[in-house]
From Swiss-Prot:
Cofactor(s) this protein cannot do without: Mg(2+)
Protein family per UniProt: Belongs to the bacterial CoaD family.
Biochemical pathway: Cofactor biosynthesis; coenzyme A biosynthesis; CoA from (R)-pantothenate: step 4/5
Gene behind the chain: coaD
Residues annotated for substrate binding in this entry: 8, 40, 74, 88, 134
Keywords annotated in UniProt: ATP-binding, Coenzyme A biosynthesis, Cytoplasm, Magnesium, Nucleotide-binding, Nucleotidyltransferase, Transferase
ATP-binding recorded as keyword: yes
Descriptive protein name: Phosphopantetheine adenylyltransferase
Length: 160
């Protein structure tokens, strides 16, 4: 089965990478879909191309993982790449409530499309891209929260 794992990934965290690695063991092919939201231009720390490069570097050891950018409806991207399902990581109940609504909406737009949830590993359940950016902006150590590719990109971007 071919699945899509969508997100902003601004930046990629160890939590994201854990979901990608686990999905790669469960599914034949995983496409990491990097959202490029035109209405949020200027709000991202990293451009879509930079996020894509970070993901590709961090997942280079996973032969069945690819990454691509998309804008517009996720269901259109899923159709375009020929995937059968969406994979989402869940950290907390609040994630579940939001993702459940999105799963129902996506299924309404694309009947038969499945959304599969992977629970975050406990050690990453508190990690978010927003928190990583905030800590990094203030010079805090995020090395245990992000893969080496992200750490290098953060240091370069923030001049550290």
């Amino acid at each position: 089965m071919h699945v899509v794992y969508p997100g902003s990934f601004d930046p990629l965290t160890n939590g994201h990478l854990d979901v990608i690695q686990r999905a790669s063991r469960l599914f034949e092919k995983v496409t990491v879909a990097v959202l490029e939201n035109p209405s949020k231009r200027g709000q991202y720390l990293f451009s879509a191309e930079e996020r894509l490069a970070i993901i590709r570097e961090a997942t280079a050891h996973l032969a069945n993982v690819e990454a691509a950018t998309f804008s517009g409806l996720l269901v259109d991207f899923v159709r375009r790449v020929g995937a059968q399902a969406i994979v989402k990581g869940l950290r907390a109940v609040s994630d579940y409530e939001y993702e459940l609504q999105m799963a129902h909406l996506n299924r309404q737009l694309y009947p038969g499309l499945e959304t599969l949830f992977i629970l975050a590993a406990t050690r990453y359940s508190f990690v978010s891209s927003t928190m990583v950016k905030e800590i990094a902006r203030y010079g805090g150590d995020v090395s245990k929260l992000v893969p080496p590719a992200t750490l290098r990109a953060l240091k370069a971007k923030l001049g550290q």
